[in-house]
Amino acid sequence: MDFPSRFDVIVIGGGHAGTEAALASARMGVKTLLLTHNVETLGHMSCNPAIGGIGKSHLVKEIDALGGAMALATDKSGIQFRVLNNRKGPAVRATRAQADRAIYKAVVREILENQPNLWIFQQNCDDLIVEQDQVKGVVTQMGLRFFAESVVLTTGTFLGGLIHIGLQNHSGGRAGDPPSIALAHRMRELPLRVGRLKTGTPPRIDGRSVDFSVMTEQPGDTPIPVMSFMGNAEMHPRQVSCWITHTNARTHEIIASNLDRSPMYSGVIEGVGPRYCPSIEDKIHRFADKESHQVFIEPEGLNTHELYPNGISTSLPFDVQLELVRSIRGMENAHIVRPGYAIEYDYFDPRDLKYSLETKVIGGLFFAGQINGTTGYEEAGAQGLLAGTNAALRAQGRDSWCPRRDEAYIGVLVDDLITLGTQEPYRMFTSRAEYRLILREDNADLRLTEKGRELGLIDDQRWAAFCAKRDGIEREEQRLKSTWVRPNTEQGQAIVDKFGTPLSHEYSLLNLLARPEIDYAGLIEATGGEAIDPQVAEQVEIRTKYAGYIDRQQDEIARLRASEDTRLPVDIDYTTISGLSKEIQGKLSQTRPQTLGQASRIPGVTPAAISLLLIHLKKRGAGRELEQSA
């Protein structure tokens, strides 16, 4: 049979993790196969039609900075864009976009189909070929065998997926799609820790049955933001508004009186749901003192009447769903197009992974996305890109790569997962990062694109745009530094008139920009400078105003990095290290951290224990030096 069976990398699953993994691998020049159960659902948004948000947009921008597809697909499909936390500092500002679900999926598929080195094939994966603790390939549903150096599993909610509506349940990967049962059984045979998690989705509403006049309109921002460093507002489709309404006492009464029919509260569902995206049942139960909860009415697209009521995810029986929806203001006559549901699925303890997202026990087998216990398109895409990159690096015989916590939110995400593990779906927040001021969404390209180019992820067009931006920032900062304004001159008076800022002596424009009351656009207007790229202007202003704080964080990072990156030997026996408590010895032996920094983030491992480890490593190193000299 003249059909390719040997590849460098095989990716299982065509969701947000799988598409980024396959694209990253193929961009690096290795022969990549993407196996999906249905080509029509590549890049499908299974839950809400939105990308970005607090902490999440930072991941999207980092994916973009490394050449990924998510941000550009969002710019081409986004029907509403907003910057959250706009009145706060740049560290926590976050771009969020409502996407047209159909356009987003179409854009992702177009990118995949036009990516060199990438083969797409519609088949379920039912088995892994493993020999001597090394993955060698996969077996599909119809018995085809494909071989590769690396395999990336991005199975989402499909592994052993079980859909719940009320007390009834059935197998499914998501509504309308079959689960991966054979692969789930195969995975449970491997020496990996497995658990069950749960997520859910609300009923979809026909917009023609909704009264928007009694809701609060939520328009997008003007000027319209963009998500990709390569994007622009001209890419965006027509922009629309979202709407806000609220639950009420009647809604809560309906839910509370039917909790005995909820699979979550009747013991039918065993998996743990996402803490930060709870079902409406959870909200009513956990926050019984609250009189109402916000419901965001989000359009599913420009060519459909379907609406996504964000905030009422539920797995209650359909008759209860209908009653609770119709109790909400503006939805008294609502028609439900699709019922809400909960889904349980298998995930694997991410503490069994290396930083590369390769499993510790099966060489060449990588995990990305919900299989690692995360929730969210952005978290999945970030892991997919990293896993695909490292799968390709392994196939090329090169060292693996993962950004540190002080380099990227991707680094924070991976370090949290493989060090701490998770017992509930993990969601990214800016509060999880220690160095938020350095890890802003606006500078993701300055942090990561050079590394992406080195890895082979960045094409010539993106590299040229990045270099132009980087050089433009340097030129403008130098211009501001070397341009001086004196009191009692035309420029000096213009600054006083514009900002009410008296000039007591000569200042450089860079010194003036550092003042909190002076903004870059106003400074250029007052001093007659030329307009420059808005991305360059943004960087110049942020870097200047926050220079002191940024320098302080950089100094702190430099101090910590020496011990943070100290490697712990694979064969280290923690039970032989005197001074460590039995509890800490047990935690270190179970987790097997790769570095001192990772060890320090294990719950219960004290600073004193880290000091003992450092002393042990120094003694061990000195002892080996003596052995070698003898």
Swiss-Prot record:
List residues binding FAD: 13-18
Record GO cellular component, one term: cytosol
**Residues in coiled coil:** none
InterPro entries under this entry?
FAD/NAD-bd_sf (IPR036188), GIDA_C_N (IPR049312), MnmG (IPR004416), MnmG-rel (IPR002218), MnmG-rel_CS (IPR020595), MnmG_C (IPR026904), MnmG_C_subdom (IPR047001), MnmG_C_subdom_sf (IPR044920)
Q: Does the keyword Flavoprotein apply?
A: yes
Query: Organism's domain of life?
Result: Bacteria
Q: Which cofactor does it need?
A: FAD
- Main location (coarse class): cytoplasm
Where does it localize?
A: Cytoplasm
Q: Which residues bind NAD(+)?
A: 273-287
Quote the function comment for this protein: NAD-binding protein involved in the addition of a carboxymethylaminomethyl (cmnm) group at the wobble position (U34) of certain tRNAs, forming tRNA-cmnm(5)s(2)U34.
The Swiss-Prot or TrEMBL record describes its family as follows: Belongs to the MnmG family.
Q: Its quaternary structure? A: Homodimer. Heterotetramer of two MnmE and two MnmG subunits.
Write down what this protein is called: tRNA uridine 5-carboxymethylaminomethyl modification enzyme MnmG
Source organism (scientific name): Pseudomonas putida
Q: Which gene encodes it?
A: mnmG
